[in-house]
Amino acid sequence: MKRSEIDRSKLSPMMKHYVELKDKYEDTIILYRLGDFYEMFFEDAEEVAHALELTLTGKSAGLDERVPMCGIPHHAAEVYIDKLIKKGYKVAICEQLEDPKTAKGIVKRDIVEVISSGTVINTNSLNEKENNYIGCLYDFSYGFVLTYSDITTGEVYSELLTNNTDDVIYKILSLDIKELIVNELINKVLLSKIRSLKIPVTIQNELLNDKYQNIYQNISDARIVNSIKLLLYYLDVLQKRNLSHFQEVVIKEKEQYLEMDIHTKRNLELTECLRTKERTYSLLWLLDNTKTAMGSRKLKYFIENPLLDINKINKRYDIVSKLLEEFILAEELRNDLYEVYDLERLCGKLSFGSANGKDLLQLKASLKVLPSIKEKLEKLGFYEKITTMSDLYDLLEKSIYEEPPNTIKEGYLIKDGYSSELDELKDLSRGGKDFISRFETEERERTGIKGLKVGFNKVFGYYIEISKSYLNMVTDDMGYIRKQTLANCERFINPILKEKEDLILSSEDKIINLEYNLFIEIRDKCKEYIPELQRTAKVISEIDVLSSFALVSEKYNYIRPIITNGNEIKVLNSRHPVVERVLKGEEYVPNDIVMDNNTDILLITGPNMAGKSTYMRQLGIIAIMAQIGCFVPAEEATLPIFDKIFTRIGASDDLVSGESTFMVEMMEASRAIKYATRNSLILFDELGRGTATFDGMSLAQAILEYVANKIKCKTLFSTHYHELTDMEKTIPNLKNKHVSAVEENGNITFLHKVKDGSVDKSYGINVAKLAGLPDEVIDRASGILNIYENKEKKTDTIIQTTLPLNFDEKKSEVEEEVKNIDILNITPIEAINILSKLREKVK
């Protein structure tokens, strides 16, 4: 049955109200509160019953047939809502706004909140280590503004983007934005691409009034302000969110942070492993020894936004150095940080009015350690201050029970002694319950019925229960009124018991209502501290990150780099921080990376799997570590400030446009040489390999010449085109490097040491042998290689290389494993692990 086909004049008042709400919230699933259940009707019911595997039933609504219906218990609603959100639905919560017991006529109901993938506030459904961003993309004809916010923390960011739609897409993907609001001017091609990524999109033009002007009052750019107000309208008006905890908008300006596109972040495996898409084996995984959820999120932000300001970087170094010097103090500080809960998201709960008793206890526990943290920060000379908010701690200490329930409408929230009125009601209630206990004893003595019990349930209230074996002792003069007969007993009431019941239940209702009102007062008082709590959260998250840097630096022997305004690179005995940690039973081979004022390009040759890609990634990661304020894995390090990093490492097809590997290579090369400056870093791994040999070699040489003569930025360029190494003779700012290997009796040993000069062999067949390819294949490949190397006639070569191959069929476990390796997408870390396992199998 479809809503559009029914005769609305016949609907019951309740169902008519539901249909009117559904007309307003057409794009949502409405959960309509009826007693202890949220119910769905018509198409919503059919869709949700299928999506969540619920029983589809029907409900009388005044029509000739029952309307489709399904329902979920209100106490378990969060679980079901979470499932719906993950399936891409929006959910509108329609609550009862008055007590059904006292309502006259139909109970008042209305939508109180709308939940979508970008506006989830249930922290149990979110990853505490990551932000959950909702974004607003504002198209102003010749560019875009992207404003995005994590509504659970109140953080809001805004940045101007070019009109390059691919750049916009990659920015959205890089931020992992869960939901997007766009204005009606939006580029239709871009909109189609966004929707193809399964990101929910809402188109609207309405801007919010100046209700939350305080968060953007210092911004003069009307485009940015309009983008912010577009997002605020969606959150405030359409989703009915209280945004009083929203912080001042941070404008992300290119002059402040090192620029990296999504390809660079993925190629360098900054926040997730390229192959598994998980944190493990990423730089974030290595550096994250934070003690708080806020610190973990802040660390991710640091890694994705390295600084350009040397003074700010050195301030971070100074704190890390101090933490290493004061190691006992640092450990005590980390112990204190462990006691701090997620203050940012607690502020969100206070603002939304969803904080319960347990949330306030978490706030109290966090406030308790602030004096100790403040004292330690002062000893460390930390550049930010915190306040302890002792008056708020005192309020929570004297008011909230140590073990409150999950809801705030059950009572047992407020401590004795906080409210004299509440204490009086509790005394009355306890006195009544004491009476019940005495009454049971007295009745046993008066009647002689030893099996007499006094019980309680919500249907009958208090009752007297007598088992069947004692029923013959019940007489009329006892004054018992039979109420219920069960299999093994009967239940009675009497006037005295009912009188006390009314008194007890009346006082308990009053207690629950008073506790609720007192709790709301206390929560509202906490809400007044949100700005102060957010400032404190910012300081704690930053010191947590720097404390993690100190711990990792001490543990893995990192050193403080020297950052200069020049362009020289001198990193001695450097290591790849992640690779060295995952090598099992093998010693990591460190390498120097030295590029003086006269050297802009290192052209790197060497065997496959020898470590060229690792060497290149190593410099990129060390540069990023240095610019986020972390010490680096080396014996000595002097580095310039890089404004941008461009990479092309590994081979993969485009995520969005479906372009081929070679096309993506050229697009990324184009982006690098178009936008790179003298202060940028370019890392190109075997550029040009995706096409014919001479095409690829020509392009590689032309790109190298352009970088050397026009851009003159620091560049690491690996290649198998050995002819390119002759460029060292004609380009003075290019130097050859090679990754050394030793060949003996047809076997190759990787030394993983980068040395001056070039090599003239790729050792591809040796690597194939090491990987476990069958001997027949290796022998045949060696023969063909000899033909090419001996420069036989072309026709003869073709004949020779197309002779029928009579390999014996032979399958082995190693062969099957080698076949299954995804060579194009494998990372150096994974390759090392796979080769190690294969080598063990063929020993």
Residue map of PLM features:
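Charged, surface-exposed helical/loop "interaction arms" that form contiguous linear patches used
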Residues: 352, 356, 366-369, 416-417, ...
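ATPase nucleotide-binding head domains, primarily ABC-like/P-loop NTPase cores
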Residues: 42-45, 221, 291, 296-302, ...
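Amphipathic heptad-repeat alpha-helical coiled-coil/stalk segments that mediate oligomerization
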Residues: 206-211, 259, 274, 365-434, ...
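Extended, charged coiled-coil "arm/hinge" scaffolds of SMC/Rad50-like chromosome-maintenance ATPases
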Residues: 486-524
